[in-house]
């Protein structure tokens, strides 16, 4: 019974992580807005920022990884590799959200020392999309951290007792 409970919990966490990272990638990849400000055409798009591209790629990889692991048998010799891969994916997602958050902050607040003006007043829909993507990405990172802890606990601690 404990094995079934562990497997169900693992599947639920993986599905949630898959959903969060896939949502983050899709919402960020579809963020786009064009407006005119003082007779200048402004286009805001995720692909104009390397940090946002990195965020989309990292979340797409994280969601594909979670989807693949849903089909991995719960017993086998691959689990030490899965735990190591979970660490890599968790850190990958953490670095991508950190990079994206720093750019989003500059977009929202600007940087008076560098002379960069905030853009969210001119392209609010774009900023709302980015905020939603970052929220989903943060949820994905938290889920991956929980998943990593759960995997370590079930595969290392429970198997030794």
Curated annotation (Swiss-Prot):
- Mind telling me which InterPro entries this protein's record contains? CASP/CASPL, CASP_dom, CASPL
Give the highest taxon in the source lineage: Eukaryota
Q: How does it sit in the membrane?
A: Multi-pass membrane protein
Determine if Transmembrane helix is one of this entry's keywords. yes
* Similarity remark: Belongs to the Casparian strip membrane proteins (CASP) family.
Subunit details: Homodimer and heterodimers.
Family annotation (NCBIfam families): A_tha_TIGR01569
Protein name (record):
CASP-like protein 1C2
What organism is the protein native to? Vitis vinifera (Grape)
Q: What is the lineage of its organism?
A: Eukaryota, Viridiplantae, Streptophyta, Embryophyta, Tracheophyta
């Amino acid at each position: 019974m404990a094995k079934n409970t562990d497997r169900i919990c693992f599947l639920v966490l993986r599905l949630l992580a898959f959903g969060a990272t896939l949502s983050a990638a899709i919402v960020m990849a579809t963020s786009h807005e064009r407006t005119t400000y003082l007779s200048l055409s402004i286009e805001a798009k995720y692909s104009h920022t390397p940090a946002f591209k990195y965020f989309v790629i990292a979340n797409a990889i994280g969601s594909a990884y979670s989807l693949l692991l849903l089909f991995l048998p719960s017993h086998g010799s691959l689990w030490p590799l899965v735990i190591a891969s979970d660490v890599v994916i968790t850190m990958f997602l953490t670095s991508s959200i950190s990079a994206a958050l720093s750019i989003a902050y500059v977009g929202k607040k600007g940087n008076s020392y560098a002379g960069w003006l905030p853009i969210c007043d001119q392209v609010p829909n774009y900023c709302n999309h980015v905020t939603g993507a970052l929220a989903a990405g943060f949820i994905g990172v938290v889920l991956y951290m929980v998943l990593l802890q759960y995997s370590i606990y079930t595969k290392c601690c429970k198997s030794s007792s």
